[in-house]
Amino acid sequence: MTDTLFEYDHILMRSEYRTPDIHSHLALHLIVGLGGGLHCTVAGDNFDANAVFIASDILHTAYSDSGEMLVFLFDSTSRYAYEINRRFLHGDSHVCLDSDRVQKIRSLWKAHQDSICNADRAILEYLCLSKNSDLQLDERVAEVLTILKELDEVPDDAVNYLCGRVCLSKSRLSHLFKENPGISLSRYLAWEKMRKGYIHFQRYGNITEAAMRAGFDSPSHFAATCKRMFGISFSEYTKS
């Protein structure tokens, strides 16, 4: 079973999926084993941990023998991601949390598991992760992110559309994205399309409707992108 909270800048899942394929995506992870430890592979390193932060765009997989995990995915352009990089990762591919922090997160989940929203808030507050960081984005990049947030879909001509809205050439806008927040615009658009697909699935409960509304060519394209980005099939994600 998978319980999911969708916020625009992050996702929290209580998952029971097992052995996802090795994959990478633009989100930063926090993965916490609820019923025991995790078996992790990150950037080619195999290790066991109880909880781990994983940087953006790093090949990884993690699973628990019990199957039950808390899985956070933080948008790499968000203030949460900025704080995680600044306070925990320090440029590394991953960092494991100490036992005291893990036990506190587990206890917070147990205390709030009847409300995933309350659990999310309590855990982020405990880790001192705040939206109110001193992250500074180029104003044109910030405008693009706002425009994308307001769109229901990511169209095929999204780059041209965004360039027109912010009065920049393709090369200039792509350069700004690569410079700040440090990711490829085309890859971010693919991530954004995936996110909108999940949002529409939550809203309509139908993969065909979700795929079409998000801008995918077909439901199979949506499902294949899910498998590639997250290492699990869409059917595994939707089991509940």
What are these regions (language model features)?
Residues 160-168, 173, 177, 210-217, ...:
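Append "Primarily bacterial transcriptional regulators
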Residues 112, 128-133, 143-158, 177, ...:
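Basic, amphipathic alpha-helical hairpins
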Residues 1-2, 15-20, 220-225, 229-230, ...:
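Helix-turn-helix/homeodomain-like alpha-helical modules used for DNA recognition
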Residues 179-217, 223, 239-240:
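Terminal helix-turn-helix DNA-binding modules in bacterial transcription factors
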